[in-house]
């Protein structure tokens, strides 16, 4: 029964793995719900910032703020690439990187250079492995990242845009659609589109006059920064929800596969045990007949 003991050892090993994947599935489910709630709570703030910024930009058309300039010749582009810090989340990072690298290749074919800010270690390692120009990064962000962790890399990229050293900035991340579906997204963060600055405030029969301190332009310049930061943070939260959903699905598949493997191993064990019993009975009968 040496073979039977080996099979039992394999069964116990697979059962232990199944317990781990089941626990990881449950943890990912909990984290995904918390991230979704964080996304929901952050949206009203981002929308209010956008509305006030839109109002100020429309009433101060000669603001001269570099971050609101819309028409530039594209010579150099920046990317904010958001990926996860950990693996075991299916093809989530691979799909984002595929979309990102296709756009980088398209720019390179046009002779346009790139500068990349990586949020998440998977994207950073991928960019470094193929020799892309990574100018800043933030990794090991945890399950509840703080905006302060992102300010350094983002500020550097935004300042380069203000100095006309970068002419466009893309935001690349995995968008959360539902538990079973996450899609790679690429959006133009800068220049800010007309759909953002356009009149989106609720219509009112009254005409309000606002006073801004110290000045309307100072408030507008401040809000533009806060708006850009809120968009990036929303994308990061979206990506984290996608990561947990993908990991939950991957761990469920692993748990189910482990269950199927255990069934197959038990079947093999029972067959080998039955064969061993049959052999022993045959030997006993043969011995009795010989006597």
Curated annotation (Swiss-Prot):
One BP term from GO: proton motive force-driven plasma membrane ATP synthesis
Predominant localisation class: membrane
Alphabetized PROSITE patterns for the sequence: ATPASE_GAMMA (PS00153)
A single cellular component GO annotation: plasma membrane
Record key words, sorted: ATP synthesis, Cell inner membrane, Cell membrane, CF(1), Hydrogen ion transport, Ion transport, Membrane, Transport
Pfam family, any one: ATP-synt
Keyword DNA-binding listed: no
Gene3D superfamilies noted in UniProt: 3.40.1380.10, ATP synthase, gamma subunit, helix hairpin domain
Topology relative to the membrane: Peripheral membrane protein
NCBIfam families documented for this protein: ATPsyn_F1gamma, PRK05621.1-1
PANTHER family in the record: ATP SYNTHASE GAMMA CHAIN (PTHR11693), ATP SYNTHASE SUBUNIT GAMMA, MITOCHONDRIAL (PTHR11693:SF22)
Summary of subunit composition and partner proteins: F-type ATPases have 2 components, CF(1) - the catalytic core - and CF(0) - the membrane proton channel. CF(1) has five subunits: alpha(3), beta(3), gamma(1), delta(1), epsilon(1). CF(0) has three main subunits: a, b and c.
Descriptive protein name: ATP synthase gamma chain
Organism field: Neisseria meningitidis serogroup A / serotype 4A (strain DSM 15465 / Z2491)
